[in-house]
Amino acid sequence: MALTLEALAARFGGEIVGDGRCEVGALAPLDQAGPRQLAFLANPKYLAQVETTGAGAVLIAPGDLEKLGAAAHGRNFIVTPNPYAYFARVAQMFIDLAAPPRAAGVHPSATIDPAAQVAASAVIGPHVTVEAGAVIGERAQLDANVFVGRGTRIGDDSHLYPNVAIYHGCTLGPRAIVHSGAVIGSDGFGFAPDFVGEGDARTGAWVKIPQVGGVKVGPDVEIGANTTIDRGAMADTVIDECVKIDNLVQIGHNCRIGAYTVIAGCAGIAGSTTIGKHCMIGGAVGIAGHVTLGDYVIVTAKSGVSKSLPKAGIYTSAFPAVEHGDWNRSAALVRNLDKLRDRIKALETALAAREGDAGGA
């Protein structure tokens, strides 16, 4: 389905420059777009591509349009302060238009406990299991093989993709999106040591601590594929509103993730850690337990966080990749830092002694 630029601007805002009757029915990159496709410029370094693009129209910021000057003549634009966000909203609209909603109802192979409540407008796919006391909200969509444990609540307009497992006693707010393989509400990693003796004479065991809390997920949260969020030991693990979590992320028990925070793939967050609002956690970041990150903290990829970071800012501890020979030389220096320190101290002592002798003379 194609829409005019006028229709897009009426829905999403923005100023039209050029022909508002231009129709676009899809999105494409600047260097690949055709005359019935909409492209966007979010990074000024690609400004030259706007001059050569075949796109029917381009989403562009006011400052970038000014830089184009005469090159903008004869082209169509929607001018908006944030072309990237505009693009995202248009993309979602096109997806919604192309994929008609599935008919409400429960697939014959699904297992719904009589004590569960499933909204008449919900879509329950093949082999879904919904246990007693669970509540499935209006227009929620549960795809094949989803499991919803006893007493769990799934908010209105939520979408659980195939093979998602939501354990008992959890809550997902409205418009939650949970991708395939995610597990919410599994036991936190809690074991009490009960050992006596030393060495080979040591006896005893790790005693499992029952995890009796739950997981509370706020509205408009998205959780990536194969991500795991552990239930709290006593209180709930909490994911606040509009948090976006990538694939393969581990969030330990009793954590609290503040609103609008984003967490990239393969990050690991140990238990009882609090992350503030509007934070950005890079890929493969490791965060120790029982620490607090303040609001607006950014941790770059592969960094290790071992203590609290209360102040807003950008934090890095990862070593970027270098050529192998350079790495070996750097590693050799690190291994010998204690010797270098001792040599410097000895030189400083000798120099101080010389200066003392010279002063005495």
Curated annotation (Swiss-Prot):
Keyword Lipid biosynthesis: yes
Free-text function comment from the UniProt entry: Catalyzes the N-acylation of UDP-3-O-acylglucosamine using 3-hydroxyacyl-ACP as the acyl donor. Is involved in the biosynthesis of lipid A, a phosphorylated glycolipid that anchors the lipopolysaccharide to the outer membrane of the cell.
GO biological process, one term: lipid A biosynthetic process
Pathway: Bacterial outer membrane biogenesis; LPS lipid A biosynthesis
Stored CDD domains: LbH_LpxD
Protein name, entry field: UDP-3-O-acylglucosamine N-acyltransferase
Cited Pfam families: Hexapep (PF00132), Hexapep_2 (PF14602), LpxD (PF04613)
Name of the gene: lpxD
Cellular component annotations (GO), alphabetically ordered: membrane
Gene3D superfamilies: 1.20.5.170, Hexapeptide repeat proteins, MurE/MurF, N-terminal domain
